[in-house]
Regions:
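N-terminal secretory signal peptides that target proteins for export/translocation
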Residues: 1-32
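Sec-dependent signal peptide recognition
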Residues: 33-41
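C-terminal motif of bacterial Sec signal peptides marking the signal peptidase cleavage site
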Residues: 48-50
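Accessory carbohydrate-recognition regions in carbohydrate-active enzymes
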Residues: 55-441, 447-504, 512-539, 545-548, ...
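ATP-dependent phospho-/nucleotidyl transfer catalytic cores
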Residues: 509
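Short aromatic-glycine motifs in intrinsically disordered, low-complexity regions
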Residues: 728-736
Length: 795
């Protein structure tokens, strides 16, 4: 064969050609190998460079927030019962996409497929519902007025939800809608297709409303009065909307009648439609503001907060505001999921209570009072249920935002002066929801932690008034106070529901009064009165069952009794949950149980007993019951507030390491930044604040003590920038999914044996170091001298 040498053949021309070709092949192979090596090296360098860049250029915390966390919820099962709030921290107005009709508490639900508008909302909870809502919805075509008519399909893949910005593609109209907020205003931007019938529908909703189109000013003004209670007769939300281009057509819709060319009028439900002839990709912008005071004030809010500013400018400023506030806690050394969950929960702690005041034409702070309907000077806050938030959400504000805490106290002073009572669940005025007089906890905790700038004497008088009876609704003051003050408990058979829960929460509130009375130098008889009432929790403790139990007027316990029965003597829980509501005297509770060892066994039992429940009080399993049942954690019900502090109570026993184990279990198992990321209602920042505190490594079991009980931090490092600029560095360098136990704690390099850290120590800044281990340190924190505060131990 040509080019092939056979044995015995003399070398010839073909052989020489073969050698040349072989050398060429070898050369090409060397080049190929060198190329592969060079390319691989370049790829490695690029990868390492990218990794280094990723470490040195962190993602902004505002972009780590998933505002959709908790939105996969419904009436029978809550994964948060949240909505994607587009707002500034504690802003007067929020904005949210709407997937259901106004008045449905689940206004945005992750599993829904259609959007009906982007509405201004003030809803603190689906159970309280919304007020003062109106919406904007871009459409094309005629007859797209009502929510059902104008609804458009959308996909989460074409949706961007940030704290500072929301964007969605409305597939039925080929429109992109965007919104970005200020405190009392917002900017909208709509990108339209080519159409002669592009329009924006402004819906003031039913309940009494008005729209007025002013074409020559490219403006719509109006008001809405929709609410679910807690407002005076003259309640209005006045709004103004100014577009950046003239209207090509307009019409009004009033109580079902469409009136082309009409500039609008009043009615039960009014809608304005303003239209444009647009080219594909053409953008139309609108500036929106509102006021609870007047149209003139709404105009002031609009010009003060959006005048001369572009959409991008407002969005960038809102993003920067969130980055500043969220960036005050910087976490490192966790998984991507943990970091995103942390910032998503931290965002939720900065929404409520909302600002309910405005700045008048002279720059003075004024507010419309939802208590008496007057416009008055000073601050006011609303949309908060203290039954939930006294536990951790409010203490987090006190720690991180002392000036805000002072303003909230000023707002409580004004609420009392305007209504005669402290609010317990305000939205915007008094609402008949939940129990207790937990405003006492907020006030005592703030004052005892050094928060000033308000009239504490007025608040003291308000707290004392609470102890004597209830106000215009049963949730204000103390329902059953007469029985409580004379018998030392609210009786089971006196026709007052949730009586054990009331007794326990009143006893803690009395402890708050006792602490504050001593600090204020009140007369000794007052101090002794409240000191005695702090022990009323003992009156509803059954020493045979080692659980809290309803007690009758004659002093006998309720019968029959099941610790699995929800409601009845308790509030959204059962005896397994409420037995631990002795925040101020855990040592006293342990004594009743027969000692600290027995209390540890009872704590264990909550996780060991099956998730049985008796729902006969409600007639069906309320969502809190179902959330407990499905978590596979026995009768532990983290999805509701009464039990959230419970796992920290191991720190009051000879087995403090069990707190560390359980805290990490709850953080890992029951929280995630996804739409189903909570294990129950988020509730105005409370369930989120539990996660934030716990991830940092401590928790305020007893607001009013100035102590935080130590747990198990989630991250290797967290840097907390305090209000005065000092930095608190929380370090746990050995932290991991396996190393969940605390072997040793050092505060500023000095070994600390106690199971708590004080508020004063945190405010000093410095370094709090946790040395972590895979196995528990069964010696640390076991001495009674190292335990957190309890009234009975004399600390």
């Amino acid at each position: 064969m040509p080019g092939v040498a056979h044995p015995g053949d003399a070398p010839g021309e073909d052989f020489e050609k073969t050698q040349v070709i072989g050398k060429m092949i070898l050369s090409f192979e060397k080049i190929r190998r060198m190329t592969v090596v060079v390319i691989s090296a370049l790829f490695l360098i690029m990868t390492l460079s990218a990794c280094r860049q990723q470490k040195t250029v962190p993602v902004d915390p505002a972009d780590l927030v998933n505002t959709l966390m908790g939105t996969d919820s419904e009436y029978l099962l809550s994964h948060g019962n949240t909505y994607p709030a587009v707002a500034l921290p504690f802003g007067m107005n929020f904005w949210t996409p709407q997937t259901r009709r106004n008045g449905d508490g689940w206004g945005y639900t992750y599993d829904d497929h259609k959007i009906t508008g982007i509405k201004q909302t003030h809803q603190p909870s689906p159970w309280i519902n919304d007020y003062a809502a109106f919406s904007l919805m871009p459409v094309t075509g005629a007859g797209k007025i009502t929510e059902d008519q104008r609804a458009s399909w959308f996909s989460h893949k074409a949706e961007e939800a940030r704290p500072y910005f929301y964007s969605v593609y409305l597939a039925d109209y080929d429109i992109t809608a965007e919104v970005t907020p200020t405190e009392r205003s917002a900017l909208f931007r709509f990108t339209f297709p080519e159409s002669d019938s592009s329009a924006v529908v402004i819906d003031a909703f039913a309940g009494g409303s008005m729209v007025k189109i002013i074409p020559e000013e490219k403006k719509i003004i109006g008001y809405c009065r929709n609410n679910h209670g807690g407002v005076p007769e003259n309640f209005h939300n006045y709004f103004v909307i100014v577009f950046d281009r003239e209207f090509d057509f307009f019409s009004a819709w009033v109580d079902g009648a469409l009136m082309p060319g009409s500039t609008g009028q009043e009615g039960d439900r009014t809608v304005a439609v303003v239209g444009f002839r647009t080219e594909r990709g053409e953008q139309v912008s609108a500036r929106v503001a509102s006021s609870f005071i007047s149209h003139e004030q709404a105009e002031l809010n609009l010009e003060r907060e959006t005048g001369g500013r572009s959409f991008d400018n407002v969005r960038d400023a809102a993003r920067e505001r969130w980055n500043i506030e969220l960036g005050r806690i910087r976490v490192e050394g966790g998984t991507d999921d943990q970091v995103r969950t942390f910032y998503s929960t931290l965002y939720r702690t900065m929404l409520f209570p909302r600002i309910f005041y405005e700045y008048d034409g002279t720059g003075e702070i004024v507010h419309y009072s939802p208590y008496n309907g007057q416009v008055l000077p000073g601050r006011l806050f609303t949309d908060n249920g203290f039954w939930d938030t006294f536990r951790a959400a409010m203490p987090l504000i006190t720690l991180m935002y002392p000036e805000m805490s002072s303003h909230i106290m000023e707002g409580l002073v004004n609420a009392y002066l305007e209504s005669g009572w402290l609010p317990e669940w305000a939205s915007p005025g008094h609402r008949n929801c939940m129990i207790g007089s937990n405003s006492a906890s907020l006030i005592a905790d703030a004052y005892l932690k050094g928060i000033r700038g308000y009239n504490i004497d007025t608040l003291w008088n308000a707290m004392v008034k609470n102890t004597k009876g209830h106000g215009p609704v049963h949730s204000v003051g103390r329902y059953g106070a007469g029985y409580y003050n004379s018998l030392g408990y609210v009786p089971y058979d006196a026709g007052i529901n949730e009586n054990v829960a009331r007794t326990l929460e009143y006893a803690y509130a009395d402890w708050c009064l006792w602490r504050l009375a001593k600090e204020l130098g009140r007369p000794q008889e007052e101090v002794e009165l409240y000191a005695g009432r702090t022990q009323n929790y003992r009156n509803v403790f059954d020493s045979e069952r080692l659980l809290m139990r309803g007690k009758n007027l004659d002093g006998t316990f309720q019968s029959p009794f099941s610790p699995y029965k929800w409601g009845d003597a308790f509030t959204e829980g059962n005896s397994w949950h409420y037995t631990w509501s002795v925040f101020h005297d855990v040592a006293g509770l342990a004594e009743l149980m027969g000692g600290e060892e027995m209390m540890a066994r009872m704590l264990d039992s909550v996780f060991v007993v099956p998730p049985l429940f008796d729902d006969s009080y409600y007639g069906f399993p309320i969502h809190e019951i179902r959330e407990m049942q499905i978590m596979n954690m026995g009768n532990y019900a983290h999805g509701n507030q009464p039990v959230q502090h419970m796992i920290y109570l191991y720190k009051y026993t000879p087995e403090p390491w069990k707190t560390e184990m359980r805290v990490r279990e709850v953080m890992d198992k029951l929280y995630n930044y996804t739409p189903d990321g909570y294990c129950g209602d988020e509730d105005n920042g409370q369930t989120s604040a539990w996660y934030v505190f716990s991830a940092l490594g401590f928790y305020p079991v007893t607001p009013g003590t100035g102590e935080y009980v130590l747990g198990s931090p989630l991250f290797r490092k967290a840097t907390v920038t305090l209000a005065d600029g000092k930095e608190l560095v929380i370090s746990a360098p050995e932290n991991s999914r396996e190393n969940i136990y605390v072997n040793e704690v050092l505060l500023n390099g000095k070994k600390s044996r106690v199971s708590f850290v004080t508020h004063a120590q945190l405010l000093e800044g410095g370094k709090l170091e946790f040395r972590m281990s895979q196995a528990p340190n069964t010696d640390r924190g076991v001495s009674p001298a190292w335990r957190p505060y309890s009234m009975s131990n004399g600390k």
